[in-house]
């Protein structure tokens, strides 16, 4: 919901599963969120860029979370296409 100034005033903004696009409910204690950061190859330090993936508990229960993370990382260019 937005106020008159166009600012977001919701107290709770639900997350969506990156793999299935389902809403992750507040009581889904099996869900995980992974943040993968960009690293400078020379210094080994974190740069400003990062990518966040949220996986719902239903995907994890089926045992498909590793395949989903690899598919999403390939799509974003974090992993080579022939991995």
From Swiss-Prot:
MF annotations from Gene Ontology: ribosome binding; structural constituent of ribosome
Keyword match rRNA processing: yes
Keyword Transcription regulation: no
InterPro entries the record matches: Ribosomal_eS21 (IPR001931), Ribosomal_eS21_CS (IPR018279), Ribosomal_eS21_sf (IPR038579)
Main location: cytoplasm
Disulfide bonds: none
Subunit details: Component of the 40S small ribosomal subunit. Interacts with sta.
Family note: Belongs to the eukaryotic ribosomal protein eS21 family.
Name of protein: Small ribosomal subunit protein eS21
Organism: Drosophila ananassae (Fruit fly)
């Amino acid at each position: 919901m937005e106020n008159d100034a166009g600012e977001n005033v919701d107290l709770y903004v639900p997350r969506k599963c990156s793999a299935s696009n389902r809403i992750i409910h507040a009581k889904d204690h099996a869900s995980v969120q992974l943040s993968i950061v960009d690293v400078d190859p020379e210094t080994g330090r974190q740069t400003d860029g990062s990518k966040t993936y949220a996986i719902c508990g239903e995907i994890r229960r089926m045992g498909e979370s590793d395949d989903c993370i690899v598919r999403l990382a390939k799509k974003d260019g974090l992993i080579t296409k022939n991995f």
